[in-house]
């Protein structure tokens, strides 16, 4: 079915993966006591592989501030429920939709005015930045604006993957 999973299911699965990562890190420390602790990016707003097929025509919806905050709270609870309170301190980013998308026939450029409320909301979280997916077709100016506005992790994929494949 083409139905999005609930935030609770996504967060639970994320926490389950973090349990495995934390266990692997503890094993790594036995051989490498100076190993860096893993960091985590959480979220539920991940686009389909290859980008949206209709987003350019219909217009993208920027993540609502309330949805972003609910995502953070849901993941924090899932980490807590899996005894990962210490690991939660290593969550550094949250995946959001800042209004950019890539697709076969083009891309939706970043419009900071449409994302202003979302971008302002990250300032409430001192330890977090946004991760923006599908940013590799944005202009240099748009990339700079994304970073200035709070997208500290630019997720590339389709363009880079295509170039490597070719």
Model regions and ranges:
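Internal, well-ordered domain-core segments that constitute the primary functional module
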Residues: 1-50
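Conserved, mostly hydrophobic/aromatic
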Residues: 146
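Flexible, glycine/charged-enriched surface loops at secondary-structure junctions
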Residues: 24-37, 81-91, 133
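Short, glycine-/Ser/Thr-/acidic-enriched flexible segments
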Residues: 47, 99-101, 137, 159-161
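Active-site loop/helix belt of alpha/beta enzymes
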Residues: 14, 41-81, 85-88, 92-100, ...
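Hydrophobic faces of well-ordered beta-strands that scaffold small-molecule active sites
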Residues: 1, 38-44, 92-96, 128-133, ...
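Glycine-rich phosphate-binding active-site loops on the catalytic face of alpha/beta enzymes
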Residues: 1, 139, 149-165
């Amino acid at each position: 079915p083409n139905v999005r999973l609930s935030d609770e299911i996504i967060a639970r699965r994320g926490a389950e993966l973090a349990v495995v990562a934390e266990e692997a890190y503890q094993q790594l420390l036995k051989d490498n006591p100076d190993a860096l602790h893993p960091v985590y990016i959480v979220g539920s707003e991940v686009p389909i592989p290859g980008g949206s097929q209709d987003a350019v025509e219909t217009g993208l919806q920027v993540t609502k501030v309330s949805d972003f905050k609910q995502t953070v709270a849901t993941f924090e609870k899932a980490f807590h429920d899996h005894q990962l309170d210490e690991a939660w301190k290593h969550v550094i980013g949250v995946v959001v939709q800042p209004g950019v998308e890539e697709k076969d026939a083009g891309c939706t450029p970043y419009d900071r005015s449409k994302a202003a409320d979302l971008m302002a909301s990250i300032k409430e979280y001192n330890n977090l930045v946004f991760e923006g997916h599908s940013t590799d077709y944005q202009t240099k100016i748009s990339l700079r604006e994304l970073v200035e506005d709070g997208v500290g992790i630019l997720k590339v994929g389709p363009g880079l993957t295509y170039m490597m494949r070719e």
